[in-house]
A protein has these predicted regions:
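Structural signature of eukaryotic scaffold interfaces centered on beta-propeller domains
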Residues: 74-89, 130-144, 190-203, 236-241, ...
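Surface-exposed, charged secondary-structure patches
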Residues: 2-27, 133-141
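Short, surface-exposed coil-to-beta transition loops
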Residues: 30-36
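Surface-exposed loop/turn elements that mediate protein-protein interactions on large endomembrane-trafficking
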Residues: 46-74, 101-127, 158-190, 210-230, ...
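A short, structured loop/turn motif at beta-sheet edges
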Residues: 4-12, 41-44, 283-287
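C-terminal, active-site-flanking charged/polar segments
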Residues: 280-292, 297, 309-324, 334-347, ...
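Beta-strand C-termini and the immediately following turn/loop, strongest in propeller blades
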Residues: 94-99, 147-153, 197-214, 241-253, ...
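Beta-strand elements of well-folded, non-transmembrane domains
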Residues: 18-22, 43, 352
């Protein structure tokens, strides 16, 4: 399948998706390949501005093996793999997602179940890139999974529509069923940005989803959907993996007067006051909450007319809300903060007065290292190489045995009636700036300056939440003569 990603008078970007079969010895393997091209053309030349090929192995039931305690996940990008172990002292499970598939491994009985896959044997209409899977609850007693699939619905009763489908997988019955479908017509970017912040289900069967500026509470057993919190700024919200949701309260769209912290498991609420400062949540590192304080006098326009949110202080609270770290650097402001495991990276800048405006000059980066306790430290993914397939991903399962587990696929139960629920659509769209790299949405920002900084670093294209492309950065070009077909292999020279 060929998908046009962007086009204007001089440049175009598209992706080419296809499946290939590889034979090595007695092994036949299928791979899903996605190629990204970005081109610029003139009257006589075609320039290849960017190219990337990504490939992921299409793991089938016959491909499942455990070698020296590691489950083979095949060739692919390890960053696309998510996993977790759960269960009781008597029964352990591990779920893993990757390449738009969900698998469940019964560690105790050595049974591997393909719970969900986007592929449909009855269709051959090509894969859709704009889709995601997220496990929202794993029951340690029964082994059951609850998860959402969001984006383009590739098959089923809602095939061809975009939205969020809530699924339940019964481990005992090996049965997959649809619970609720929420249509969403504002685009994948808006959907993904909210669900990445909050998609969580508690033990009582209440699922919380952030869509646009509203948190919805869904009773998955009754199929009832209500509004839990509304009129939020999703850029100023965050959530922990165990159901602690943080939002700004008071203030304006840039920052709040206090943080409102809600435990979605118990319903208990508490606040963190900003005092004379404005306050914003920045994210979670494990169970540690990170937030920033902003001097209200610094919430002013820069010379481009955009209000910046320079953070003067960064604070870290542990799960008991004790302050364990404070960061500030005289003369510098934190303009962007990213969290990866226990590593906190901060982009710094100095304020420069420019007439009636305040601009910011790059002042490098700084870091905070937190020792985050990993609940799944005995379960991890690494790469190993063999003589046939080369580098592959392996999921280590806290055992040293080698064996071929029992493999099975979940049966699907059609509910037989309409399970769609309408969310509170709004004509107002919160302005966000989405940075696309290699044809995929890579990051979202509340200000254009942050988006441009990121796009400059990673050669991206910026699109607003109103579907307007406003900025592009070209990469290094490779040249074809115009008479050559773009997708052949011509002789090239570097521009």
């Amino acid at each position: 399948a060929i998908r046009l990603k962007e086009i204007n008078t001089e440049t175009a970007a598209f992706t080419l998706s296809y499946t290939i079969e590889s034979s090595a010895g007695d092994i036949n393997t299928f791979y899903n390949v996605n190629e990204y091209y970005r081109l610029r053309w003139t009257d006589s030349k075609v320039y290849l501005l960017d190219f990337e090929r990504r490939m992921a192995e299409n793991i089938g039931l016959a491909d499942i093996t455990v070698s020296s305690g590691a489950l083979r996940l095949g060739i692919g990008d390890a960053s696309d793999i998510d996993y977790a172990s759960y269960g009781t002292d008597q029964q352990q499970y591990t779920w893993v997602t990757g390449d738009q598939q969900l698998w469940l491994y019964d560690n105790t009985n050595r049974i591997m179940t393909k719970v969900y896959t986007e592929e449909d044997d009855n269709h051959n209409c090509g894969r859709q890139d704009e889709a995601g899977i997220k496990v929202v609850h794993a029951d340690p007693e029964t082994g059951d999974l609850y998860f959402i699939v969001y984006g383009y619905m590739h098959s089923g009763n809602y095939e061809g529509r975009e939205g969020v489908m809530v699924y339940h997988f019964s481990h005992e019955d090996v049965l997959l069923e649809d619970l609720v479908f929420i249509p969403f017509n504002k685009g994948f970017e808006q959907m993904r940005s909210g669900l990445e912040e909050l998609a969580y289900m508690n033990d009582d069967g209440t699922l919380y989803l952030l869509l646009e500026d509203t948190v919805y509470a869904i009773d998955v057993n009754m199929g009832k959907m209500d509004v839990a919190y509304k009129d939020l700024n999703s850029s100023n919200c965050t959530a922990s993996g165990d159901g602690i949701f943080v939002m700004c309260d008071g203030g304006d769209e840039n920052a709040g007067e206090r943080l409102k912290i809600v435990d979605l498991n118990s319903g208990k609420e508490r606040t963190v006051e900003g005092g004379d400062w404005r306050i914003v949540p920045l994210g979670y590192a494990g169970r540690d909450l990170i937030y920033g304080l902003i001097d209200p006098q610094m919430l002013t326009e820069d010379s481009s007319g955009v209000i910046r949110t320079p953070i003067s202080e960064v604070h870290i609270l542990d799960e008991n809300y004790n302050e364990v770290k404070t960061y500030q650097k005289s003369g510098d402001y934190v303009m962007r903060l990213t969290i990866s495991d226990g590593n906190i990276s901060m982009k710094l800048a100095k304020a420069i007065k420019n007439g009636n405006y305040t601009d910011y000059q790059d002042a490098g980066e700084d870091y905070i290292i937190r020792n985050i306790e990993n609940d799944d430290q005995k379960i991890y993914v690494d790469k190993q190489k063999d003589s046939i397939r080369g580098q592959q991903n392996w999921l280590h399962l806290n055992t040293s045995d080698s064996f071929v587990p029992i493999s099975q696929s979940a049966r699907y139960l059609d509910p037989g009636y309409d399970i769609s629920r309408k969310y509170e659509d709004t004509d107002q769209v919160e302005m966000q700036y989405y940075v696309y790299t290699k044809g995929r949405m890579d990051a979202a920002f509340a200000t254009i300056q942050e988006a441009v900084d990121y796009g400059t670093t990673y050669a991206g294209t910026i699109m607003t939440s109103h579907k307007q492309v406003i900025w592009q950065k070209a990469g290094r070009a490779y040249i074809w003569d115009r008479i050559l077909t773009v997708l052949t292999r011509p002789a090239v020279h570097r521009a």
